[in-house]
């Protein structure tokens, strides 16, 4: 039977090579991560080509507005800012892959090792992969459709600019998808780890009620202590991977959040403009209007899915801490080794609490996400009011 998850991941893997995002190779069967001359040269040439087209686009002074055939200055400024940020984000992503090539290779090695140790992870993350793949593919397909729809009014400069925007958009989408996949694996591993910890807690609670503490009791406590130490080691590895993600994807994460922020504000304003002026006055066809509406919806959904993925990791970690707190309701003390294992794990978590940050500056929490959404709404309203007053 064909495993569509494996085929999908292989397709994304090849896509990363073709677009120049991956500058090293790996073998999932052996866990080997290595550099190759072929991959390095191809990625370097692809990145140079993107850089040359960007330079040409900025020196050619082509039309930056390929969506609205009739637009005011504010529309053009918003489109320039959104497009410029997307290009900068793509360039920083590419540059970061070269500067942190070694760290990225180590992260991939850890991810493959985690996947090989727990083959059941594949069945746990398949629907998350499918959802993310569908959204990403739909966004890129609609972007290409919009670009093809505008071909009849483009010159050479506009064509090159369009190619640049598509390339950097694909690069950013792939980089965000890679981050999503790693977080998804960490989420699944946390679920497995929580299930194991729950079994240890339940067994320890049962043992705490036993009055007769013979050799079998001691043996069972030693077994549970080993299980608890294994859980603590896995939790430490997961937390290390989260730290590696922040280090490797930190700058990309900052650019992605900035892109999400400004793009949501910009698309909110563009939606208002279409409502205010009407598609006809903006010379926007019905087909383009429908595509834009679907694209905006998918863009919002993509931001929601990415953010929820990280928040769920924090939820699983909170459940992990809650399970450990149940140790206080045990009827009596257990074997000294098991007690020390519990204390060691709690000390490990207290000394190094799990945090997900963007460049170590912006914490990813429900509170910070709500504050960001409120800021997006306020700035969208401000931009709309500015349009109402001056245009």
Curated annotation (Swiss-Prot):
One of its GO terms (molecular function) is taste receptor activity. Probable gustatory receptor which mediates acceptance or avoidance behavior, depending on its substrates. Residues 26-39, 96-127, 187-284, 385-391 are extracellular. Belongs to the insect chemoreceptor superfamily. Gustatory receptor (GR) family. Gr22e subfamily. GO terms for cellular component: axon; dendrite; membrane; neuronal cell body; plasma membrane. Expressed in neurons of the terminal external chemosensory organ of larvae. Its main location: membrane. This is Putative gustatory receptor 36b. GO terms for biological process: monoatomic ion transmembrane transport; sensory perception of taste; signal transduction. It is found in: Cell membrane. Keywords: Cell membrane, Membrane, Receptor, Transducer, Transmembrane, Transmembrane helix. Disulfide bonds: none annotated. It comes from the Eukaryota. It is a multi-pass membrane protein. Residues 1-4, 61-74, 149-165, 306-363 are cytoplasmic. The chain crosses the membrane at residues 5-25, 40-60, 75-95, 128-148, 166-186, 285-305, 364-384. InterPro entries: 7TM_chemorcpt (IPR013604).
């Amino acid at each position: 039977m064909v495993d569509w998850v494996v085929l999908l991941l292989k397709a994304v893997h090849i896509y990363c090579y073709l677009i120049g995002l991956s500058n090293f190779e790996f073998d999932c069967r052996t866990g080997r991560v290595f550099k190759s001359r072929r991959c390095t040269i191809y990625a370097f040439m692809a990145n140079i080509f993107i850089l040359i087209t960007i330079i040409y686009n900025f020196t050619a002074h082509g039309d930056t507005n390929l969506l609205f055939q009739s637009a005011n200055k504010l529309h053009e400024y918003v489109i320039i800012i959104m497009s410029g940020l997307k290009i900068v984000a793509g360039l920083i992503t590419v540059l970061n892959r070269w500067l942190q090539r070694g760290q990225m290779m180590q992260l991939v090695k850890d991810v493959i090792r985690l996947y090989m140790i727990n083959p059941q992870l594949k069945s746990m993350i398949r629907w998350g992969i499918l959802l993310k793949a569908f959204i990403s593919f739909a966004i890129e397909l609609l972007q290409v459709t919009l670009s093809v729809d505008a071909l009849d009014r483009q010159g050479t400069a506009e064509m090159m600019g369009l190619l640049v925007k598509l390339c950097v958009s694909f690069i950013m989408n792939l980089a965000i998808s890679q981050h999503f996949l790693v977080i998804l694996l960490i989420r699944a591993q946390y679920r497995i780890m929580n299930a194991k910890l729950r079994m240890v807690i339940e067994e320890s609670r049962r043992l705490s009620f036993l009055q007769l503490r013979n050799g079998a009791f001691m043996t069972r406590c030693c077994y549970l202590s080993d299980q608890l130490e294994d859980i603590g080691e896995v939790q430490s590895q997961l937390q290390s991977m989260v730290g590696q993600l922040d280090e490797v994807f930190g700058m990309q994460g900052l650019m992605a959040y900035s892109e999400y922020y400004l793009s949501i504000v910009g698309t909110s304003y563009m939606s208002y403009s279409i409502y205010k002026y009407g598609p006809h006055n903006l010379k926007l066809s019905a087909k383009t209007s429908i595509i834009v509406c679907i694209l905006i919806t998918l863009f919002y959904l993509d931001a929601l899915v990415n953010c929820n993925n990280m928040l769920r990791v924090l939820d699983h970690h909170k459940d992990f801490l809650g399970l450990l707190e149940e140790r206080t309701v045990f009827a009596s003390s257990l074997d000294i080794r098991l007690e020390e294992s519990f204390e060691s794990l709690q000390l490990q978590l207290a000394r190094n609490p799990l945090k997900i940050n963007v460049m170590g500056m912006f914490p990813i929490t429900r509170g910070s996400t709500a504050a960001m959404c409120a800021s997006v709404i306020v700035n969208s309203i401000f931009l709309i009011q500015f349009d109402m007053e001056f245009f």
